[in-house]
Amino acid sequence: MSNPKRYRNLFGITLGTGLGGGIVRDGELFLGDNSAGGEAWLLLNRLDPAVNAEEGASIRAVRRAYAMACGIPHDNAPDPRTIAEIAAGAAPGNRVAAIEAFRRLGVVAGDVLAQALTLVDGLAVIGGGIAGAYPLFLSHLVRARNAPYEGHATPLRRLAPLAFRIDDPAEREAFLRGEVCSIEVPGSGRRILYAMRRAAVGISRLATSEAVAVGAYAFALRELDKR
């Protein structure tokens, strides 16, 4: 039996100079009444609720976290590419601090996705200049997104759908396979197929400038089709 599950909703974030966000609803870009839909940068910062999420998931956030862990001024911290190389052991520096900087990025970005996807209920795509360092933060991001609320007698799931990493072969296979069960419609005597509630987190393969160009082109074509 083939899986009937199909997706038409998506939430995307970009990790770079800032924290960007965008929503695709039922196959169309969601703008909002004030053209301010998807302002992810203003969501809660899980690790520092006194500031917004962008201060925990951006270039300056990675540099700041590395500088704090090293006890050096923020201006003396290297750029995220170098910090990623330090974390991978490919460049000299404080490796523990570099790993921690990207862990914090993953936690904040994962919580942002959890907040957004609570309402959007769709797939998640991550892009931007820092996305290339995903091996250092994606596991923390998915863990934060799947993390339960612990304040209940029994832990309560943060999101109804379970998140899977598309870049991981085993998780991708589990996501694509899913589970389909047959449930009875009360009072009808009929049974329907019900697919497992699941979502995926993926990394954009497009460079930031290319993604912007492709997105703008697709949006323009759709707007022309409406005329």
Predicted features, each with a name:
Residues 1-10:
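Conserved phosphate-binding catalytic cores of ATP/NTP-utilizing and phosphoryl-transfer enzymes
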Residues 2-3, 47-227:
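ATP-binding/phosphotransfer module of carbohydrate and carboxylate kinases, centering on a glycine-rich
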Residues 6, 15-17, 197:
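Short, basic and Ser/Thr-rich N-terminal targeting/leader segments
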Residues 12-14, 19-24:
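Short beta-strand scaffold segments in enzyme catalytic cores
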Residues 22-26, 30-32, 45-46:
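Short beta-strand-to-turn element immediately C-terminal to the catalytic PLP-Schiff-base lysine
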Residues 29-31, 39, 141-144:
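Glycine-rich, phosphate-binding/catalytic loops in enzymes
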Residues 31, 42-44, 203-205:
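Structural signal for conserved beta-strand scaffold positions within catalytic alpha/beta enzyme cores
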Residues 35-50:
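A short, polar/charged loop-to-alpha-helix boundary motif
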